[in-house]
Amino acid sequence: MAGEKDQSFFRNQVVADFGCGPRGSLCWATQARERIGIDVLADAYLHLGADRHNMRYVRSTESVIPLGDDSVDVLCTLNALDHVHNLPVICAELLRILKPGGTFIGSFNLNEPPTVTEPQTLTPEVLDQHLLRFLELKSRRQVPRGESSAYEHFFSATPAKAPAADAVQVLWVRGVKRGRN
């Protein structure tokens, strides 16, 4: 994940996935000290067999993630922030739980029109304002959304053409949280 050659990056780390979904998104991170899935539907996932994933599920709300300040070493969120109603509040919560010097890994679908289940239209400017400016970015890759797969341009040998600013795109970032916000 995020350009690491193996899982040793996660060794003895507390790793969390915000918007984890029901499928054990961190099952593979076996070298982590603790794996935490954070989701508003976490309680429901336990009834779907999530208790077999060898990770702790934590139910968040749209305004509170019930973890301590600076408690997470590696925080992932993959295509989840467009699902929240109050982006500034949840971004502040993500930054609160991530330790200074901790690694943030995120993927975001950009410029998609809002829907009932995805009420946010994320743009680079909105993400910079509420989240990314608090990180020292190590990598930032923004490509057009693929036609057959949202992520096809990340894995193809042919580089994508630069997208128009308002085109539907995918942004991947990896950064390190700066000192206290």
List each language-model region with its residue ranges:
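A short SAM/SAH-binding and catalytic strip from SAM-dependent methyltransferases
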Residues: 74-85
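Conserved beta-strand signature within the Rossmann-like core of class I S-adenosyl-L-methionine
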Residues: 101-109
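A short glycine-rich, Lys/Arg-flanked "PGG" loop and its adjoining helix->strand segment in the class I
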Residues: 88-100
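Conserved alpha-helix/loop element of class I SAM-dependent methyltransferases that forms part
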Residues: 1-14
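Core SAM-dependent methyltransferase catalytic element
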Residues: 148-181
